[in-house]
Regions:
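A short helix->loop->beta-strand "cap" motif at the edges of active sites that frequently abuts
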Residues: 60-65, 95-96
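NAD(P)H-binding glycine-rich loop region in Rossmannoid oxidoreductase-like domains
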Residues: 1-61, 71-75
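SDR active-site strand-loop-helix element
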Residues: 33-34, 66-71, 101-103
Length: 260
């Protein structure tokens, strides 16, 4: 498909530096949108290796800017969030100037976060509510996220800095589940508080009732225990983008799924 559109495809593995030779030839901007959570144990180490190899390739081959999408939140509270942040540090240390976007949940048809919400609402008549369902987050739609990434090379203020992005709504995960139910034409699900459930049990629960692999679910659940909201909007201001509301994100995602 990409070749048919006149694009050149370079296949490689970011953990194998030799496979990246020539990947950045002729490029001005390179996007690093790689994560290794699905690989289970050791995903953080693989991410750092991949980031270093990619950054070194970009610098060696004359790439002028690297753009990376990481996560919002206090990176000291979760191995998942810490790995996202350390990946940015590796890219900045080893490569060209970095634009480091940080986002919470990205909502769009096909995204893991969206699918998890939809499956929880669609499959469970009653929902157990671990403490993390009361954590605040600031979701952003896939359309706005892609637009931030696309505009980055044309926004000089974003070079060499962190850019926190989010939609207009700050919600708890429980509130997002209720809004998903309403968007699907269902009543919000009754909730059964289970305050002492561990991240491991939460991940197992998600793995049983949603398509999310338990190996992916556990680091995600660990990250859900900390608030993921924009604390410094200044980096996003030069982009002049107005992300959609959470309800509009859901409407678009459900409509796109219905068309598939």
């Amino acid at each position: 498909m990409l070749e048919a559109a006149g694009l050149e495809v370079h296949s490689g593995d970011v953990t194998d530096a030799s496979s990246l030779r020539g990947a950045g030839s002729g490029m001005e901007v390179a996007y690093f949108l790689v994560h290794s959570m699905g690989g289970g144990v050791g995903f953080a180490e693989r991410e750092q290796l991949g980031a270093r190899n990619f950054a070194q390739m970009a610098r060696r081959e004359g790439v002028e800017r690297v753009v990376y999408l990481g996560g919002l939140g206090d990176e000291t509270t979760s191995k998942h969030l810490r790995s996202r942040h350390e990946t940015a540090l590796a890219l900045a240390a080893e490569g060209p100037p970095l634009t480091y976007f940080r986002a919470a949940m990205v909502v769009g048809a096909g995204s893991e976060s969206y699918r998890t919400l939809r499956y929880l609402v669609g499959r469970l008549p009653v929902m157990i509510t671990p403490a993390w369902l009361r954590t605040a987050t600031q979701p952003i739609g896939i359309d706005a996220t892609v637009e931030y990434l696309r505009r980055a090379p044309d926004v000089p203020e974003s070079e060499g800095r962190e850019v926190q992005i989010g939609g207009p709504d700050v919600l708890t995960y429980g509130e997002m589940l209720d809004r998903m139910a309403l968007a699907m034409g269902k009543r919000p699900r009754p909730k059964l508080p289970v305050p002492l459930i561990t991240p491991w049990l939460s991940a197992l629960w998600l793995g049983l009732v949603t398509p999310v692999d338990t190996r992916v679910a556990r680091p995600l659940v660990e990250g859900l225990r900390t608030a993921t909201v924009v604390t410094d909007p200044s980096g996003a201001e030069p982009f002049e983008i107005s992300p959609a509301s959470f309800d509009e994100m859901l409407r678009r995602a459900l409509a796109e799924e219905a068309e598939q």
